[in-house]
Amino acid sequence: MVVMNKTNLLLLILSLFLAINLSSAQLRGDFYAGTCPNVEQIVRNAVQKKIQQTFTTIPATLRLYFHDCFVNGCDASVMIASTNTNKAEKDHEDNLSLAGDGFDTVIKAKEAVDAVPNCRNKVSCADILTMATRDVVNLAGGPQYAVELGRRDGLSSSASSVTGKLPKPTFDLNQLNALFAENGLSPNDMIALSGAHTLGFAHCTKVFNRLYNFNKTNNVDPTINKDYVTELKASCPQNIDPRVAINMDPNTPRQFDNVYYKNLQQGKGLFTSDQVLFTDSRSKPTVDLWANNGQLFNQAFISSMIKLGRVGVKTGSNGNIRRDCGAFN
């Protein structure tokens, strides 16, 4: 057995830190300038076309990006389909609720990029997902921002790698902060990225515990607004089909804005992991700040999304460019 002294341990941590930062340092905005200069417009056009078909494209793509980056980094490994010999990430129970429109957005954008002769097999699925995510945020009324590019697609995808990597709707602030810290993201990044819940929906089963069986003292979570409880119970009665979905933001579910934080101030966070951002004194001042200033929230969200896009990236020979986003080459 090798005993590691403090010096060697510090050197190991430093080497890992440098390796992570060297990978993300290879990302740049003009990565495809010489190979596929119009790639961002091609992707945006494909995303716009997809949104015209269904609004679900927007929250589905945004959620897909988070689930990809938090498991093995932003490498499109969540796109891989399972085979007889490998159960992939997308088939882990925590990913089964990912809407198919998110996957289809990346597939359609990839087809559009590869239809341009000089772009064919030059742009990674990981970068296409990154660009598409930026575009759905902007097309829903959110900020426009520049993305860093140059990711390679991951070479592995397994359901077992997902366990413990994604936040649960029951998480408290300590659990949220710890999970985000594992990905190099700060408490402020966590609060900003939680703001993505201004869009999209969740299944009723994810909130049953807050409505009907919260704890030994209260059947209903006392932090939920009483009028909101009535609304939620009407939408999610106990005998309802578990596949029925409800909006994350009860007020402006199709608009990317700071109303998510205003909702938290009124006790209208859908998940425990949402409402705790307001009930915990450590995060409450940030919620109040962004509830009162949408521009500050947008700036924080952009910064945190760029940081998220650097998590666990593969560059150079650490990955490849998939011909089919759903299968390894």
UniProtKB/Swiss-Prot annotation:
Substrate binds at residue 167. Binds 1 heme b (iron(II)-protoporphyrin IX) group per subunit. GO terms for biological process: hydrogen peroxide catabolic process; response to oxidative stress. InterPro entries: Haem_peroxidase (IPR002016), Haem_peroxidase_sf (IPR010255), Peroxidase_pln (IPR000823), Peroxidases_heam-ligand_BS (IPR019793), Secretory_peroxidase (IPR033905). Disulfide bonds join 36-119, 69-74, 125-325, 204-236. Transmembrane segments: none annotated. Its EC number is 1.11.1.7. Coiled coil: none annotated. There are 73 peroxidase genes in A.thaliana. Belongs to the peroxidase family. Classical plant (class III) peroxidase subfamily. PANTHER family: PEROXIDASE 50-RELATED, PTHR31517. Removal of H(2)O(2), oxidation of toxic reductants, biosynthesis and degradation of lignin, suberization, auxin catabolism, response to environmental stresses such as wounding, pathogen attack and oxidative stress. These functions might be dependent on each isozyme/isoform in each plant tissue. This is Peroxidase 51. It comes from Arabidopsis thaliana.
